[in-house]
């Protein structure tokens, strides 16, 4: 897991503190399996009003993300569901089984004007459970059916499973795919974003997509001064060699409960860098 603990839910008047300082790690893992819940949402597109991103709507097939990226800015959204932004965000995943049908319903409305939709904003549409459920794949089929443009961002090599659909979308200039590459060091990504694809696998996905004619680039995201900023030249070089057509970066953001989670992670996994990172 990425988070070390569950932070208190800011909307919950009660908070339980464990009576042990250092829980047994194996026992803790046994007690924290990933649980999946049905999400009964009756709409599927979230409207974006921020001028900082280049799309008006996003689609999140899931809520929460088992990738476990400790820095994830979306963690506080789990608090609105009655969960913690900490381990709950990684272990209690809401699944929108009806997402493809709801998307088709939306695109069928006379009021809908085709425009770019992002997969995703607050989750990774290719997190591990997607391998079995194929909700993202079925959504891509709807995008293709209605010739609606889509932009995708992921940290998972599973995106290459859908190359057949992405090729068809690319032939109609309807898709862009971005792989987030935080570091080229597996030892770092293995604790920073533990259930994502490893760096070489993401770069291999870039190559596979580029060779298939799918527009693909990378995000150096998040950029964490004192932790991965010195890697930027090497990441850009590796991405260019892999076939990336563009590169962006996003500075780390630590809203709400994410800040204490990240600082706790630093002290646990990178104590020698904790002070440097906090003071940058």
Predicted regions and their residues:
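Residue-level detector of anion-binding/catalytic polar loops
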Residues: 149, 215, 245
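Conserved strand-turn element in the central/C-terminal portion of the radical SAM core barrel
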Residues: 184, 192-195, 208-229, 252-254
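Conserved Radical SAM active-site core
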Residues: 27-62, 70-178, 182-189, 199-206, ...
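Short, solvent-exposed amphipathic alpha-helical segments in soluble enzyme
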Residues: 167-169, 195, 237
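Active-site glycine- and acidic-residue-rich loops that bind
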Residues: 157-160, 224-233
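Auxiliary Fe-S-binding modules of radical SAM enzymes
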Residues: 1-40, 46-47, 230-280
């Amino acid at each position: 897991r990425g988070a070390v603990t569950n932070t208190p839910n800011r909307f919950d008047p009660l908070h339980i503190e464990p009576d042990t300082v250092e829980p047994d790690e194996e026992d803790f893992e046994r007690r924290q399996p990933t649980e999946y819940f049905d999400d009964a949402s009756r709409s599927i597109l979230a409207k974006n009003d921020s001028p900082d991103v280049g799309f008006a709507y996003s689609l999140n097939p899931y809520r929460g993300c088992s990738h476990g990226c400790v820095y994830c800015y979306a963690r506080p959204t789990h608090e609105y569901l009655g969960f913690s932004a900490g381990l709950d965000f990684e272990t209690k995943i809401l699944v929108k089984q009806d997402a493809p049908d709801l998307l088709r319903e939306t695109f069928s409305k006379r009021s809908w004007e085709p425009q770019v939709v992002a997969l995703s904003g607050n989750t990774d549409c290719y997190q591990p459970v997607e391998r079995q459920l194929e909700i993202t794949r079925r959504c891509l089929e709807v995008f293709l059916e209605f010739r609606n443009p889509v932009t995708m961002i992921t940290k998972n090599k599973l995106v290459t499973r859908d190359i057949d659909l992405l090729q068809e979308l690319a032939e109609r200039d309807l898709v862009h795919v971005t792989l987030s590459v935080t570091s080229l060091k597996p030892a770092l990504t293995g604790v920073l974003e533990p259930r994502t694809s490893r760096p070489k696998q993401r770069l291999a996905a870039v190559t596979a997509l580029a060779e298939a004619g799918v527009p693909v680039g990378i995000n150096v995201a998040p950029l964490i001064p004192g932790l991965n900023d010195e890697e930027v030249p090497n990441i850009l070089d590796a991405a260019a060699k892999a076939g990336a057509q563009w590169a962006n970066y996003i500075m780390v953001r630590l809203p709400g409960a994410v800040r204490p989670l990240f600082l706790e992670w630093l002290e646990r996994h990178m104590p020698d860098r904790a002070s440097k990172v906090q003071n940058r």
